[in-house]
């Protein structure tokens, strides 16, 4: 088993995990199943395969069963048994403190993370599972607090494992609980003039998450003292939005009061946290931009009034500032903008929603927008990235059942109506439409027929309606080849009408090898008619060797008399 790349640290952790595995018979059946799923996620050999993908759905199901509304309470029910077994009483209590902190921190993650908050536990699962593995690794080392902070117990150990000792979530919880050892350590890190305890991003993330004012004040002084240290300034600005609102507000006030937005690193950090102006931030993050952020964060009523603004930057930052405190508050404001707002307002709203990483909310809002704005292709260009986002026509994995209608539409009739809306858009545009500038002078948007057909394909997939699949066959040639191959291999496997059979047969001669391969797999499981075999014979005149092999394999499945006829025709 490999839990971490660092070999020395891995050897330190494994005995603890092995002991947990050996003693799991003490667990009740349900907790034992959860434990097995977590271990598969923990083990790097299984984390990125089918087994590793089971943890999040398991937790999501528990959230649904227990009606958990706040991430702070995620491990209060049946998950608490797993937590206690994995970590023991002390670390489990500390993890509960971490969850209370997490409820006030952004849920977004990855390169496109933004300062958006919600207590919805399903939105925090990436962060929570990462933190749980971090707590378990630290618990498994058996290190005391000082050894964890130092990255080892001896100079030799520190040299080999310190860089692999992530502990920012643990530190944040310790700060929140008033742990003097951790607080004093971070004070020394922030004020030290030597490299004994080198400041890193994990330290800054822990301080931001905890919101502990004395440490924030030291961080603010460090920000002011950075002088020519652009890297230090950027690290502070890019981590100050990973914590509670108070951390961001305090450090942002230092930036504003001292005009630090003149530095390129500060501009980049602000652009990342808001989601606009990331490219060429030095030109786009102006004093007006910074003033709007400060004003809206401190005057939420003015932010709501600004939703009627004709200035797209002001409108965007007003939406961002509302989501900064609670993304769900945006949902109540949306219907009026969609129904009564100008086109630029709706486009700006949809553009902003991409930064929320809130798939369920974004689909609901984009669905409402399509009802009203399906006759405006430029608006549809902003709708589609949010619409049914999360579905993927992958040929790999167990996707045969397809997405559930109830997760995306109220009724079958609504889904069919949206299918027709998409057809209308398809017929009203060329193969690719470009809208430039779009919302902001530096932005462009694109809408392709392939994008539209993909969403139509998702609807036919979830409806299991043969007539609708027949209708889509006329539009499938426009679909990007990889997705078209996925549609053939999943939705048209097997075909449920003669028209679908003919489309799959035609795809056997497609230019794309992916499409040809999937068509061959589908046809291999069918009994072809004499007329269909004649069409297969036609493919032998093409030069693609693998196409000819597939055609011959299909023809060889014929009864002897029909096979003899094929041979005579081909000789």
Residue ranges and their predicted role:
Residues 83, 99, 103-105, 109-211, ...:
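Long amphipathic alpha-helical coiled-coil/heptad-repeat bundle
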Residues 194-196, 229, 282, 310-312, ...:
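Short inter-helical turns and helix N-cap capping residues of alpha-solenoid HEAT/ARM repeat scaffolds
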Residues 313, 467, 482-483, 499, ...:
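Structural detector for tandem alpha-solenoid helical repeats, activating at a conserved register
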Residues 112-119, 166-177, 188, 201-210, ...:
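Structural detector for internal amphipathic alpha-helices that build alpha-solenoid repeat scaffolds
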Residues 55-58, 67, 75-79, 83-105, ...:
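Extended HEAT/HEAT-like alpha-solenoid repeat tracts in very large eukaryotic scaffold/adaptor proteins
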Residues 1-92:
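Charged, amphipathic alpha-helical stretches
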Residues 23, 41-45, 61-66, 85-90, ...:
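Residue-level signature of the C-terminal ends
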Residues 145-148, 152, 180-189, 213-223, ...:
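Amphipathic alpha-helical scaffolding segments comprising HEAT/armadillo-like alpha-solenoid repeats
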């Amino acid at each position: 088993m490999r839990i971490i790349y660092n070999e020395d640290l891995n050897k330190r952790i494994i005995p603890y995990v092995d002991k947990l595995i050996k003693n799991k018979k003490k667990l009740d059946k349900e907790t034992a199943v959860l434990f097995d799923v977590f271990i598969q996620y923990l083990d790097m050999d299984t984390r990125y395969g089918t087994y590793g993908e089971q943890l999040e759905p398991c937790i999501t199901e528990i959230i649904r069963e227990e009606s958990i509304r706040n991430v702070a309470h995620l491990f209060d029910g049946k998950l608490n048994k797993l937590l206690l077994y994995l970590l023991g009483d002390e670390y489990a209590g500390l993890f509960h403190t971490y969850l209370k902190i997490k409820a006030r921190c952004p849920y977004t993650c990855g390169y496109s993370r933004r300062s958006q908050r919600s207590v919805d536990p399903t939105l925090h699962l990436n962060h929570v599972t990462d933190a749980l593995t971090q707590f378990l690794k630290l618990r498994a080392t058996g290190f005391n607090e000082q050894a964890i902070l130092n990255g080892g117990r001896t100079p030799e150990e520190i040299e080999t494992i310190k860089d692999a000792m992530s502990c920012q979530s643990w530190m944040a919880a310790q700060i929140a609980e008033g742990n003097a050892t951790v607080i004093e350590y971070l004070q020394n890190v922030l004020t030290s003039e030597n490299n004994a305890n080198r400041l890193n991003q994990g330290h800054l993330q822990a301080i931001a998450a905890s919101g502990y004012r004395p440490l924030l004040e030291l961080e603010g002084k460090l920000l002011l003292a950075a002088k020519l240290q652009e890297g230090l300034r950027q690290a502070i600005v890019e981590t100050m939005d990973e914590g509670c609102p108070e951390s961001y507000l305090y450090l942002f006030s230092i930036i504003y009061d001292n005009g630090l937005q003149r530095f390129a690193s500060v501009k980049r950090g602000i652009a990342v946290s808001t989601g606009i102006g990331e490219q060429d931030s030095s030109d786009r993050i102006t004093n007006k931009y910074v003033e709007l952020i400060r004003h809206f964060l401190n005057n939420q009523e003015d932010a709501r009034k600004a939703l009627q603004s004709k200035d797209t930057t002001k409108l965007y930052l007003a939406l961002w500032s509302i989501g900064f405190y609670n993304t769900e508050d945006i949902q109540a404001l949306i219907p009026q903008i969609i129904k009564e707002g100008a086109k630029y307002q709706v486009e700006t709203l949809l553009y902003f929603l991409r930064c929320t990483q809130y798939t369920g909310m974004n689909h609901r809002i984009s669905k409402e927008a399509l009802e009203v704005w399906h006759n405006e292709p430029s608006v549809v260009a902003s709708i589609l990235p949010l619409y049914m986002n999360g579905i993927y026509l992958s040929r790999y994995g167990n996707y045969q059942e397809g997405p559930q209608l109830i997760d995306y539409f109220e009724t079958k009739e609504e889904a069919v109506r949206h299918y027709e809306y998409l057809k209308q858009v398809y017929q009203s545009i060329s193969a690719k439409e470009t809208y430039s500038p779009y919302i902001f002078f530096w932005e462009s948007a694109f809408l392709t027929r392939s994008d539209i057909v993909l969403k139509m394909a998702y609807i036919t997939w979830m409806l299991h309606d043969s007539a609708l699949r027949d209708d889509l066959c006329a539009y499938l040639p426009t679909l990007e080849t990889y997705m078209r191959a996925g549609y053939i291999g999943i939705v048209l496997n097997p075909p449920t009408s003669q028209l679908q059979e003919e489309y799959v047969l035609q795809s056997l001669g497609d230019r794309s090898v992916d499409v040809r391969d999937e068509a061959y797999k589908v046809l291999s499981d069918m009994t072809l008619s004499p007329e269909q075999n004649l069409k297969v014979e036609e493919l032998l005149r093409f030069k693609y060797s693998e196409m000819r092999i597939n055609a011959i394999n299909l023809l060889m499945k014929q009864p002897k008399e029909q096979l003899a006829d094929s041979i005579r025709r081909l000789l």
